[in-house]
């Protein structure tokens, strides 16, 4: 989780569809059935859930990482390139635990990227500094993978129907 970019998934999907007609798998704040339905409504063929699966029973992520995901919210995310030279979203509590101020991280030297060790700090990215996507608010417990998938499907079906009803209702107001 926590792979980041400066372009909204809305803009990215629209721009990509202008030149690419193949299968598009959209990610970014997708954590439940409602967001999967939204991604498909926007024109994606598939949706990718990242962070939410880190905090599952089967995940091999550190238990401290899982606990921090469950206890955190989007307000706890810091966007920085300090740890690897590449911008990413990280959990502020993990940055603080490593002895740093998440609001005072310097910019990394982009000529000295180090993807293996976290490069620009003694704390190691993905080992000590935890990544997290912005859809973290739905990560409020650590279920099994099968439970999360079942819940996502339960949410997806009515969300897809609701979108259809709402789009028909609003199209009457938009279209002549």
Give the role of each language-model region:
Residues 4, 27-28:
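Residues that cap or flank secondary-structure elements
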Residues 1-6, 55:
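Short, small-residue-enriched loops and turns at beta-alpha junctions
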Residues 9-25, 31-176:
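Conserved active-site-proximal phosphate/metal-binding subdomains
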């Amino acid at each position: 989780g926590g792979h980041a970019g400066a372009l909204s998934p809305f803009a990215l999907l629209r721009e990509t569809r202008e030149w690419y007609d193949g299968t598009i798998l959209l990610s970014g704040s997708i954590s439940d059935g409602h967001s999967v339905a939204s991604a498909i409504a926007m024109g994606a063929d598939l949706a990718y859930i990242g962070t939410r699966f880190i905090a599952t029973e089967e995940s091999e992520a550190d238990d401290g990482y899982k606990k921090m995901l469950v206890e955190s919210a989007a307000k706890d995310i810091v966007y920085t390139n300090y740890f690897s030279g590449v911008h990413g979203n990280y959990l502020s509590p993990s940055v603080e635990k490593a002895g740093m101020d998440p609001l005072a991280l310097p910019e990394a030297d982009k000529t000295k990227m180090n993807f293996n060790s976290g490069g620009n700090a003694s704390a190691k990215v993905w080992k000590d500094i935890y990544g997290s996507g912005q859809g973290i608010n739905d990560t409020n417990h650590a279920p099994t993978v099968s439970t999360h998938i079942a819940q996502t499907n339960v949410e997806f079906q009515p969300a897809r129907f609701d979108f259809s009803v709402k789009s028909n209702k609003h199209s009457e107001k938009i279209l002549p």
